[in-house]
Regions:
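Ser/Thr-rich, Pro/Gly/Ala-heavy low-complexity intrinsically disordered linkers and tails
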Residues: 1-51
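Short, surface-exposed polybasic-aromatic patches that bind anionic ligands, especially phosphate groups
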Residues: 48-331
Length: 331
């Protein structure tokens, strides 16, 4: 799907929406079994301890063994890693954090008794039907994608839509998807979601509560690449790629920051994000025209732009492609 740079998160009624730090829900404290290293490298879990997966508002954000939460720091590099990186312009591009205090992906946590409203979808055959628990002041991403993400507390499901607009007593969107955070079940093969990859939005966001409050991100991130193939690899289930080029990245391709990339000059949230990229990597979940590596994150007024600007000094050439699984033709 498409991306447009934006400066404000808009409500469904068209005005700016403010979110306090508490709106993201309660988050469990960091896993005591994981000790941040002194040298800026990837933190190591205690021997024999399986680190638990991420949580948000009392909900697991997929099981610990889900693809999003799997440590891939020791997995093999794909034999065509250099070819994929060359197609993605890695030799001349740098990371671009697509989030901050005034832009990024907003989301809201609602109670289980949140009123459900009717939904209509352009791609109804690949969308879970309504009603959805969308509040009237639903925060909507302020770019041309107009993504919306709602987490229902206790139910532990996320409801996500693409190209979202208020319509009558409910909302209209191009597509809608519901993900069960406890099971981590993927979309049916060939189905889209609020992203072109059929993947969820919320689990792939860099969030302030993790990067700063907890000091650790225990999952992969999502990024948008310029130009993708008509193909996808698990955990993706769909593609809307623009090319049949041999080494165009399929949706679901995972890159990770190389272990030998020196992190000693980084600090704060940026250091935490880079450690996560070494351990869990990031998935291609969407595409856009041009060439860039746009890392997804939650809009949060507490982000320090000075801190996040450190990410812009990380060259895309410092990444490598984790070995791909079976490649499926796109939808």
């Amino acid at each position: 799907m498409r991306i447009g740079w934006a400066l404000l998160a808009l409500s469904a009624c068209g005005g700016p929406i403010a979110r306090s730090p508490g709106d993201a829900g309660s988050v469990a404290s960091p896993d005591a079994s994981v000790v941040p290293p002194e040298d800026g490298g990837v933190p190591q879990a205690d021997a024999g301890v399986v680190s638990r997966g991420p949580t948000l508002a009392g909900c697991p954000v997929f099981p610990p063994d889900n693809a999003w939460n799997r440590d891939v720091s020791s997995e093999p590099v794909d034999s065509h890693s250099a070819d994929y990186l060359a197609f993605m312009g890695a030799s001349s591009l740098y990371l671009q954090p697509d989030f901050g205090g005034q832009y990024g992906q907003p989301f809201v946590v609602v109670p289980a008794d949140q009123a459900r409203v009717p939904m209509s979808f352009l791609y109804a055959s690949q969308s879970e039907p309504g009603p959805y628990p969308f509040p009237r002041d639903l925060p909507i991403q302020a770019n041309e994608d107009r993504h919306a993400t709602v987490l229902v507390r206790d139910e532990c499901r996320i409801y996500e839509t693409y190209n979202t607009y208020a319509s009558g007593s409910g909302f209209h969107a191009d597509s809608g998807a519901i993900f069960d955070l406890a099971s981590g079940a993927p979309r049916p093969d060939g189905w889209t979601s609020a992203t072109a990859a059929g993947l969820p939005i919320l689990p792939g966001l860099a969030r302030y509560d993790e990067a700063v409050d907890q000091g650790e991100i225990r999952h992969a991130l999502a990024f948008i690449a310029g130009g993708t193939a008509h193909a996808y690899v698990a955990p993706a289930t769909h593609s809307s790629g623009s090319t049949n080029a041999t080494y165009a990245p399929p949706m679901g391709l995972r890159v990770r920051l190389r272990a030998d990339f020196d992190l000693s000059r980084f600090n704060g949230a940026s250091l935490v994000i880079l450690r996560a990229l070494q351990r869990y990597g990031m998935f291609v979940t969407d595409s856009a025209g041009g060439q860039f590596w746009s890392v997804a994150g939650a809009q949060d007024s507490r982000w320090s732009i000075t801190d996040l600007d450190q990410l812009k000094t990380v060259p895309a050439s410092a990444f490598e492609v984790v070995r791909l699984g079976a490649v499926h033709s796109g939808q």
